[in-house]
C-alpha cells in the first residue's frame, strides 16, 4: 500500500508522525512525504522519503502578524512590543507595520505560492496514487489531495489540540489563499472537513473531534536525531535529589520576541530551591541565559525523550512535542504558554492534574518558584502524570494502527467500486 504524508514547514508539528511512517515502512508499505524544501533534510534524517515540491511557507510571518494584531487591539500581554512581522526584529512603535496593508499588497504573491504548492501536491498524488493520506494540522495539501483523489485523509495530531480547539486564527488552521478547494469543486476547508483523526493523546487529555472518527495510537516520542550523551546513564535516579528540566523553543522566541524568553526568570526561581537543573535551549537563546548558579547545567542539543525519564519535572512553553514527551515519561509539567495552541495544551494537561499552567507574561520568579515547589512536593501531580503515562501506553502501538489503516483503505476502495 502507498501512503502519502504531507507536512508543513514546522518540524515539531510532524515529528509525532515519524513513528507511524516507520511502522508503515516496516510492514512493507511505501511512504512518501510531500514537504517544503527546508523539511527535506530533517525528514531524510528521520528515515522517511521526502518529496520537496511545496513552496517555502510564510507561517512565521503570519504568526507574527497575529501577534502584532493582538498588540494593535490591546491584547498583547507583554511589556515590549512583538517583533516586526516580516523581519522578526524588535520594534518601538506599532506604526512600524500595518497588517491589512501588507496582506493587501502581498495577497497575489501568497495566492500564487499557495497555488503552486497545492497544484504540485495534487499532481504528485495523481501520479503516485496513494491509498491513504496522512497530514499535520497546518498542512493544506493533505486534506485537499485526499478529497481530490477520493481516498481517506487522516489528520495526525501533534498533541492535545485539534481542529475544533481554540481560536483558529492565522498559523493554526491552514489558509487556502488560492482557493484550491473551490478550484477542485470542493467545499472550503473547515474544521468539519476532517473526517479521520489520528490521536496519540492519553484519554484524559484527548481533545474533542466533533464528528471525526478518532484513531487512537500510542505516542512514541521522536524529537529529532541526536546522540545519547555519555553522562546521561550516570545520572542518579530521579528522587534522590529533584531534577528539573527546562526546555524552550527558539522558534517561540522568534515569534514572540526575545523579551518574552523566560529562562532567566526560571533560573532565578529555581536557584532558591534544592534542585538539580538541566537546561536545553538552542540557537541565540543560549546567549540569553547568562552565567548559571551551581547545580545548573546548560546542555548541548539532547533528544528530549532521552532526558525526561531521568527528571522529576519539566518546565516548558506548552508546545505539543514537549508536552507529549513529558506525558510519555510520566513526569509533571509546568507550562508557561504564550499563545497559539500552547494555552489550550497547557490548560488541558493542567485540568487533568498532571501539571500546572500559567501565562508566560504573568510568570515572575516568585510564581514560577511556587508552582515548581508544588509540583515537586505534591505527590498527586506525580501520580496523575504516571497514570496518564499508563493511559498512553495502553493505546494501540503504531504497528497496530497500520493494520487499522489498511482496513480503512480497503473499505474505502470497496465503497468506491
Regions found by a protein language model. Give the residues of each.
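N-terminal subdomain of nucleotide-sugar transferases
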Residues: 1-57
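A donor-sugar binding/catalytic signature common to diverse glycosyltransferases
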Residues: 21, 299-348
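Conserved nucleotide-sugar phosphate-binding/catalytic loop shared by glycosyltransferases and other
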Residues: 33-98, 102
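A nucleotide-sugar donor-handling region in carbohydrate enzymes
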Residues: 36, 175-252, 282-285
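Conserved nucleotide-sugar donor-interacting segment of glycosyltransferase catalytic cores
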Residues: 93-94, 98-183
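Donor-nucleotide binding loops and adjacent catalytic segments primarily
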Residues: 218-313
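C-terminal amphipathic helix plus adjacent low-complexity
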Residues: 370-417
Amino acid at each position: 500500500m502507498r501512503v502519502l504524508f504531507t507536512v508543513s514547514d514546522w518540524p515539531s508539528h510532524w515529528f509525532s508522525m515519524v513513528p507511524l511512517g516507520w511502522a508503515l515502512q516496516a510492514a512493507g508499505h511505501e511512504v512518501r512525504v510531500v514537504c517544503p524544501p527546508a523539511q527535506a533534510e530533517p525528514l531524510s534524517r528521520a528515515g522517511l522519503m521526502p518529496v520537496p515540491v511545496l513552496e517555502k511557507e510564510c507561517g512565521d510571518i503570519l504568526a507574527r502578524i497575529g501577534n502584532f494584531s493582538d498588540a494593535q487591539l490591546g491584547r498583547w500581554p507583554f511589556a515590549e512590543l512583538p517583533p516586526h512581522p516580516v523581519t522578526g526584529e524588535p520594534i518601538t512603535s506599532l506604526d512600524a507595520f500595518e497588517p491589512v496593508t501588507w496582506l493587501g499588497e502581498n495577497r497575489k504573491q501568497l495566492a500564487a505560492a499557495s497555488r503552486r504548492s497545492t497544484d504540485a501536491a495534487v499532481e504528485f498524488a495523481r501520479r503516485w496514487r496513494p491509498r491513504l493520506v496522512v497530514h499535520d494540522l497546518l498542512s493544506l495539501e493533505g486534506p485537499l489531495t485526499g478529497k481530490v483523489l477520493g481516498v481517506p485523509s487522516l489528520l495526525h495530531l501533534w498533541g492535545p489540540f485539534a481542529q475544533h480547539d481554540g481560536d483558529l486564527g492565522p498559523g493554526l488552521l491552514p489558509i487556502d489563499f488560492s482557493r484550491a478547494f473551490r478550484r477542485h469543486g470542493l467545499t472550503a476547508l473547515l474544521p468539519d472537513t476532517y473526517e479521520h483523526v489520528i490521536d496519540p493523546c492519553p484519554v484524559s487529555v484527548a481533545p474533542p473531534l466533533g464528528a471525526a472518527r478518532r484513531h487512537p495510537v500510542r505516542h512514541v516520542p521522536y524529537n529529532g536525531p541526536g546522540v545519547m550523551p555519555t553522562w546521561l546513564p550516570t545520572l542518579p535516579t530521579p528522587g534522590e535529589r529533584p531534577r528539573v528540566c527546562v526546555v524552550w523553543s527558539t522558534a517561540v522566541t522568534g515569534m514572540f520576541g526575545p523579551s518574552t524568553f523566560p529562562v532567566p526568570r526560571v533560573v532565578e526561581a529555581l536557584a532558591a530551591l534544592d534542585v538539580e537543573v538541566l537546561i536545553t535551549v538552542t540557537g541565540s537563546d543560549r546567549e540569553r541565559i547568562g552565567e548559571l548558579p551551581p547545580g545548573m547545567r546548560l546542555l548541548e542539543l539532547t533528544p528530549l525523550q532521552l532526558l525526561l525519564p531521568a527528571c522529576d519535572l519539566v518546565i516548558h512553553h506548552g508546545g505539543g512535542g514537549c508536552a507529549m514527551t513529558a506525558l510519555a515519561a510520566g513526569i509533571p509539567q509546568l507550562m508557561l504558554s504564550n499563545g497559539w495552541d500552547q494555552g489550550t495544551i497547557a490548560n488541558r494537561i493542567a485540568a487533568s492534574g498532571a501539571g500546572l499552567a500559567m501565562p508566560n507574561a504573568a510568570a515572575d520568579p516568585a510564581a514560577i518558584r511556587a508552582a515548581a515547589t508544588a509540583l515537586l512536593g505534591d505527590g498527586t501531580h506525580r501520580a496523575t502524570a504516571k497514570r496518564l503515562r499508563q493511559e498512553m501506553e495502553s493505546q494501540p502501538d503504531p504497528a497496530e494502527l497500520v493494520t487499522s489503516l489498511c482496513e480503512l483503505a480497503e473499505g474505502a476502495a470497496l465503497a468506491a467500486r
